[in-house]
């Protein structure tokens, strides 16, 4: 299976993504697992350190108030979606697994109608990308009950070293 992980910017998005990748790889070392990221997120260090390829795409931050960045948003988003589609085509992606953050929205839009999307929301209050992405897929998991209506509550993916603490 060829899996494209989309979650970046902060460790809160990246760690659950990498922990999921580790579990998938443990279950089947033949899985082709790649991650999306931006050049300014923590994923630039964390993803390669865990042994996964990282594909960089343009960041598309959502302006919090009307300004010039809001005018540029549609063209930036289109460019980022195109970059994700290029990665998906190169990899032959079978599924996009998203965890929120700057890279998740373009990934969800690129995958919509092409490959299945699986979303995990680790926060009690979901971010914009996961709220929008959850409309595109029935496969939504959450760490906290009632974060996203209809999502299955599964907790947060943890590293095996943490799970096995005494």
What are these regions, as identified by a protein language model?
Residues 1, 25-30, 113-114:
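Short helix-capping segments at alpha-helix termini
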Residues 3-6, 11, 30-85, 154-155:
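Conserved nucleotide-sugar phosphate-binding/catalytic loop shared by glycosyltransferases and other
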Residues 10-11, 101-103, 124, 128:
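Residue-level detector of alpha-helix initiation sites
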Residues 13-25:
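Short amphipathic alpha-helix
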Residues 83-96, 104-118, 131-136:
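Glycosyltransferases and closely related glycan-assembly transferases
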Residues 112-166:
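Active-site-proximal region of nucleotide-activated glycan assembly enzymes
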């Amino acid at each position: 299976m060829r899996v494209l992980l989309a979650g970046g910017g902060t460790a809160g998005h990246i760690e659950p993504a990498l922990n999921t990748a580790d579990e998938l790889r443990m279950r089947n070392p033949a899985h082709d697992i790649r991650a999306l990221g931006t050049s300014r997120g923590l994923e630039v260090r964390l993803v390669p350190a865990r042994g996964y390829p990282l594909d960089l795409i343009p960041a598309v931050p959502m302006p919090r108030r009307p300004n010039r960045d809001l005018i540029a948003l549609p063209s930036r988003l289109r460019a980022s979606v195109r970059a994700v589609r290029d990665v998906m085509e190169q990899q032959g992606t079978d599924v996009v697994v998203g965890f929120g953050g700057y890279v998740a929205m373009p990934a969800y839009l690129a995958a919509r109608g092409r490959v299945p999307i699986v979303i995990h929301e680790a926060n009690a209050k979901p971010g914009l990308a996961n709220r929008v992405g959850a409309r595109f897929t029935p496969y939504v998991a959450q760490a906290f009950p009632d974060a996203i209506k209809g999502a299955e509550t599964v907790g947060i993916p943890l590293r095996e070293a943490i799970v096995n603490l005494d």
